Amino acid sequence: MKIMRKNHPLLKIVNHSFIDLPTPSNISSWWNFGSLLGICLMIQILTGLFLAMHYTSDTTTAFSSVAHICRDVNYGWLIRYLHANGASMFFICLFIHVGRGIYYGSYTLSETWNIGIILFLTTMATAFVGYVLPWGQMSFWGATVITNLLSAIPYIGSTLVEWIWGGFSVDKATLTRFFAFHFILPFIITALVLVHLLFLHETGSNNPSGLNSDSDKIPFHPYYTFKDLLGILLLLMALMILALFFPDILGDPDNYTPANPLNTPAHIKPEWYFLFAYAILRSIPNKLGGVLALILSILILATFPLLNTSKQHGLIYRPITQTIYWIFIANLLVLTWIGGQPVEYPFTMIGQIASITYFGIIIILMPISNTIENNIIKL
């Protein structure tokens, strides 16, 4: 078997990626989240496949087909709640994965980092079109509000919105194409994950110390397969607790009301994992400015390799930047909170301050702290 896995054309790829892969001996549990994201993706594809067997992408029957899945299909309620809460677990792992990348300076592996940003955007697009499918009130109005943002694009905006809608409003054509997008995008994500891993294995993994670890590497299996297994068990336990005991805690009660174009919900808001970006969007009074800020809130991650001037790798020995990093995380939590609040004083003002802080930390404070720390090293 040993010779086969090293010589067989297909098994050789698996062997070099997951078994004999030379891995730094000191990587911590923060490196577990890559494999957890892979597990989340597998759970989402499998549960989504079974849901797609019973779902109908028609405005008249979409809502009742979801109710039918929960009531009449064997374990349909479990599959539905695993899929809905699995998305939340996916984004929790994704945020931690990106946060770890920033903290330990993984953005210096620029190809891997940039593919990661594309993956992040694709996952957000998948989650958005998926949220529209149950055709509840928040699904309908979320789709209307977010797709309408494209009308802010000069000259082609209105035409583009109607082209995406497939008509003059969010209707049957929109739901059908969103279902098609939601079905195909996870497979595109899977392909991008393979490219992400390809670039990662080209350079090798980063490690907590930020030093070159070529002289001290161990095989991925059995050391990290068992370490990852613990993380996977904890993830599955958390997901099952969510799906079985608190299935609706992260959802919106408005989505249990069928979509009604004549009745607008009091507060239109997306799922919790989009709230930080939604808060940034709302904090700018101008429509086009808001859309640009929304896009930049994710694309700004691509500036990390460009703005990094530090002579040290990662933040482990950099107390000034470490402090700024944790302020950034706290600010992100404030933005998430503000995104779920109504558009009124003092929430609008807090949102504007937090949005300025979000961009200010990345573009101004982190490069300044890099320079200060470089000068301290010279002393």
Swiss-Prot record:
Result when mutating residue 360 to V: In strain: Isolate UP22
Name of protein: Cytochrome b
Bilayer topology term: Multi-pass membrane protein
Localization of this protein: Mitochondrion inner membrane
Keywords: Electron transport, Heme, Iron, Membrane, Metal-binding, Mitochondrion, Mitochondrion inner membrane, Respiratory chain, Transmembrane, Transmembrane helix, Transport, Ubiquinone
GO cellular-component term (any): respiratory chain complex III
Binding site for heme b b566: 97, 196
Organism: Necromys temchuki (Temchuk's bolo mouse)
Self-association state and partner proteins as the record states: The cytochrome bc1 complex contains 11 subunits: 3 respiratory subunits (MT-CYB, CYC1 and UQCRFS1), 2 core proteins (UQCRC1 and UQCRC2) and 6 low-molecular weight proteins (UQCRH/QCR6, UQCRB/QCR7, UQCRQ/QCR8, UQCR10/QCR9, UQCR11/QCR10 and a cleavage product of UQCRFS1). This cytochrome bc1 complex then forms a dimer.
Binding site for a ubiquinone: 201
Role this protein plays: Component of the ubiquinol-cytochrome c reductase complex (complex III or cytochrome b-c1 complex) that is part of the mitochondrial respiratory chain. The b-c1 complex mediates electron transfer from ubiquinol to cytochrome c. Contributes to the generation of a proton gradient across the mitochondrial membrane that is then used for ATP synthesis.
Cofactor(s), names only, from the UniProt record: heme b
InterPro entries linked: Cyt_b/b6_C, Cyt_b/b6_C_sf, Cyt_b/b6_N, Cytb/b6-like_sf, Cytochrome_b, Cytochrome_b_C_euk/bac, Cytochrome_b_N_euk/bac, Di-haem_cyt_TM
Higher taxonomy: Eukaryota, Metazoa, Chordata, Craniata, Vertebrata
Other information: Heme 1 (or BL or b562) is low-potential and absorbs at about 562 nm, and heme 2 (or BH or b566) is high-potential and absorbs at about 566 nm.
